[in-house]
């Protein structure tokens, strides 16, 4: 935990997919109703319409027991997250173990990029309210101190439950994986909806937090930005996000729109299905990138079962894995216009959840109908993999 108490700035705009953030660092939030202030979310100021509490630095010192090392529950490139306690009615510090449990993210004092993302987090999460966005309770801006205060998410990040091995982190059961995927999809669909129109830009397992009942919520809005939606796109001169998750068109040209988030969500679905990280340099070279490794298995319903996390054993029906893979395949279309909207993804995953444990009339293991990806040679620089358009029904 020593790195929490030393100066550290983000070394690169892009960070790799392997995160050590126990709390999905840059925790996160929700707020206000389904309306968003029309004011421009500037990089230089906190919007006056942001209805969250402004804490003093001393209040948060008291709430976290003076930011003691044993209060640390997560750390990352921008700082550390501490566990604390507030009185539920007054939001004033209270003794440990009583009142409202909170998570306090303390920004490292160096780095303008970190400050900008801190402001972005407040100005988005202070305006948005949805069951699948982590709640932002307040912030502190005092002298050189910048902190964010969130609701405490008891089960930590999805990353821990998918990838960590050991007695404490049991493999996430299949039905919970489906529930988490649906919750995350609902949160992302809300961000893309009218009048919100927000591009999240950093969907990944470490940014999905789980409460005591394993309800999933999106966190870390430091890279979020307004629209555009539909077929319109921004051209960004600074590509930001996480290797392994970012859409190919965004990586190659900086073109960014809501369908870029959809691609990243497809990568997340593959992680949920396989129990493997989007990018892992500890795997053999041909298996480092999850999408590239999974592509040959996603050509048919029979082969797709070979990529399912073997720790799940007999918890799932074959057609359930096929349906999740089918959603992932279509999200991962190389052509952005061929990807589904997040509303379509929500409907597909809702259907999957509603039918868990109900065998279908056909046997998908014997059915070798193509799921979508086509094999064959393409330009290596493009790494193309094509698929059928997202139709009325996924499978």
From Swiss-Prot:
The active site is at residue 202. This is Serine/threonine-protein kinase BIK1. The gene is BIK1. A lipid is attached at residue 2 (N-myristoyl glycine). Interacts with FLS2. Activation of FLS2 by flagellin (flg22) induces the dissociation of the complex. Interacts with BAK1. Interacts with the Xanthomonas campestris effector XopAC/AvrAC. Interacts with CPK28. Interacts with PEPR1. Interacts with PP2C38. Interacts with BRI1. Interacts with RBOHD. Binds to EFR when not phosphorylated at Ser-89 and Thr-90, in the absence of pathogen elicitor; dissociates upon pathogen-associated molecular pattern (PAMP)-triggered activation by EFR-mediated phosphorylation. Keywords: ATP-binding, Cell membrane, Endosome, Immunity, Innate immunity, Isopeptide bond, Kinase, Lipoprotein, Membrane, Myristate, Nucleotide-binding, Nucleus, Palmitate, Phosphoprotein, Plant defense, Serine/threonine-protein kinase, Transferase, Ubl conjugation. Residues 67-356 form the Protein kinase domain. Changing residue 243 to F: Loss of function in innate immunity. The modification Phosphotyrosine is found at residues 150, 168, 214, 243, 250. It is found in: Cell membrane; Endosome membrane; Nucleus. ATP binds at residues 73-81, 105. One of its GO terms (biological process) is regulation of stomatal movement. The modification O-UMP-threonine is found at residue 237. There is a cross-link at residues 31, 41, 95, 170, 186, 286, 337, 358, 366 (Glycyl lysine isopeptide (Lys-Gly) (interchain with G-Cter in ubiquitin)). Its EC number is 2.7.11.1. Changing residue 250 to A: Compromised flg22-induced ubiquitination. Disruption phenotype: Altered growth traits, early flowering, weak stems, small siliques and reduced fertility. Mutant plants have a severely impaired resistance to Botrytis and A.brassicicola. Reduced plant size. Enhanced resistance to Plasmodiophora brassicae, a soil-borne obligate pathogen that causes clubroot disease. Hypersensitivity to the plant hormone brassinolide. Reduced calcium levels after elicitation with peptides representing bacteria-derived microbe- and damage-associated molecular patterns (MAMPs, flg22 and elf18, and the endogenous DAMP AtPep1). CDD domains: STKc_IRAK. Changing residue 337 to R: Impaired flg22-induced ubiquination, internalization of BIK1 and FLS2 from the plasma membrane and reactive oxygen species (ROS) production, as well as enhanced susceptibilitye to the bacterial pathogen Pseudomonas syringae pv. It comes from Arabidopsis thaliana.
């Amino acid at each position: 935990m020593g790195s929490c108490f030393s100066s550290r700035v983000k070394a690169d705009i892009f960070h790799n997919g392997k995160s050590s953030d126990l709390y999905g660092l840059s925790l996160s939030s929700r707020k206000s109703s389904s309306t968003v202030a029309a004011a421009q979310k500037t990089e230089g100021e906190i919007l006056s319409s942001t209805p969250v509490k402004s804490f003093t630095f001393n209040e948060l010192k008291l709430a976290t027991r003076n930011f003691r090392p044993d209060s640390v529950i997560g750390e990352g490139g921008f700082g550390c997250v501490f566990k604390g306690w507030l009185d539920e009615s007054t939001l004033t510090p209270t003794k440990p173990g009583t009142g409202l449990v909170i998570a306090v993210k303390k920004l490292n004092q160096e780095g303008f990029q970190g400050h900008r993302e801190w402001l972005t987090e407040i100005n988005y999460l202070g305006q948005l309210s949805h069951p699948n966005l982590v709640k932002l309770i307040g912030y502190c801006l005092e002298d050189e101190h910048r902190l964010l205060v969130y609701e405490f998410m008891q089960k930590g990040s999805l990353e821990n439950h998918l990838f960590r091995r050991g007695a404490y982190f049991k493999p996430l059961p299949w039905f919970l994986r489906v529930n988490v995927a649906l919750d995350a999809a609902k949160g992302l669909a809300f961000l893309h909806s009218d009048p919100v129109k927000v591009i999240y830009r950093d969907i990944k397992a470490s940014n999905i937090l789980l409460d005591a009942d394993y309800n999933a919520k999106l966190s870390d809005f430091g890279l979020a930005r307004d629209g555009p939606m539909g077929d319109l796109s921004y051209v960004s001169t600074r590509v930001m996000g996480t290797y392994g998750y970012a859409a190919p068109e965004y990586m190659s040209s900086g073109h960014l729109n809501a369908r870029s988030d959809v691609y990243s969500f497809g990568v997340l679905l593959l992680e949920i299905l396989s129990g493997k990280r989007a990018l892992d340099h500890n795997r053999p070279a041909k298996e480092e990138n999850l999408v590239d490794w999974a592509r040959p298995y996603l050509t048919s319903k029979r082969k797709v079962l070979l990529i399912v996390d073997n720790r799940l054993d007999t918890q799932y029906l074959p057609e359930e894995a096929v349906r999740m893979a089918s959603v992932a395949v279509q999200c991962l279309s190389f052509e952005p216009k061929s990807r589904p909207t997040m509303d379509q993804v929500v409907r597909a995953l809702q259907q999957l959840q509603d039918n868990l444990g109900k065998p279908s009339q056909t046997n998908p293991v014997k059915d070798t109908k193509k799921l979508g990806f086509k094999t064959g040679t393409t330009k290596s620089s493009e790494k193309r993999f094509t698929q059928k358009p997202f139709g009325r029904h996924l499978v």
